[in-house]
Each structure stands twice: as C-alpha cells, then as structure tokens.
Curated annotation (Swiss-Prot):
The gene is CCL11. Residues 1-23 form the signal peptide. Lung. Belongs to the intercrine beta (chemokine CC) family. Disulfide bonds join 31-56, 32-72. Glycans are attached at residue 93. The keyword Signal applies. One of its GO terms (cellular component) is extracellular space. Keywords: Chemotaxis, Cytokine, Disulfide bond, Glycoprotein, Inflammatory response, Secreted, Signal. CDD domains: Chemokine_CC. It comes from Cavia porcellus. This is Eotaxin.
Length: 96
C-alpha cells in the first residue's frame, strides 16, 4: 500500500512539473536534433518554418510535407534554399 501511494505521489509530481515546463513560453515548440540528407520533391512540400531558438541544438528548416509530416533540413544546403524560394513564390501567387 505504501509503495503504491508513493508511486502515485511521484507520478502526480512529475505530471505537474511536466505541465509547467510545457507551458513555459521561453521553450520552443519544436527543435531539430537531426536533419535529413535526402532532397525532398518540391511537389510534396506544403510549408516551412525556420527554427532559430538558442534553446535548440541547431538552426534548421522544418518542412511540412504531404501527408502531414514534418522533416528537418539543413538551411545551408542549396536544395533547402531552393525549396524555401519555391514555397515563398507559391504563397505570393496564391495571395490576392
């Protein structure tokens, strides 16, 4: 009985701490720990986001690809820069 009570208290403490950490505004919502080396077809790309937080281990571009998947890429790679330009052009032509 004492072990289960102690475990329950520990679980509640951890969950309360996790909620505070996740709600903290200074912590980025996403970080890339690895980047892909594969070039992604531009037709599969939906959008991108630049991750530059000092709390993340590296700067990266996160591409949202079809169907609803996120891929991290190295912003220094030429294909990544070309993909960003492609998405920027598409978003400009679709805006009224």
């Amino acid at each position: 009985m004492k072990v289960s009570t102690a475990f329950l208290c520990l679980l509640l403490t951890v969950s309360a701490f996790s909620a505070q950490v996740l709600a903290h505004p200074g912590i980025p919502s996403a970080c890339c720990f690895r980047v892909t080396n594969k070039k992604i077809s531009f037709q599969r790309l939906k959008s991108y986001k630049i991750i530059t937080s000092s709390k993340c281990p590296q700067t990266a571009i996160v591409f949202e690809i079809k169907p609803d998947k996120m891929i991290c890429a190295d912003p220094k790679k030429k294909w990544v820069q070309d993909a960003k330009k492609y998405l920027d052009q598409i978003s400009q032509t679709t805006k009224p």
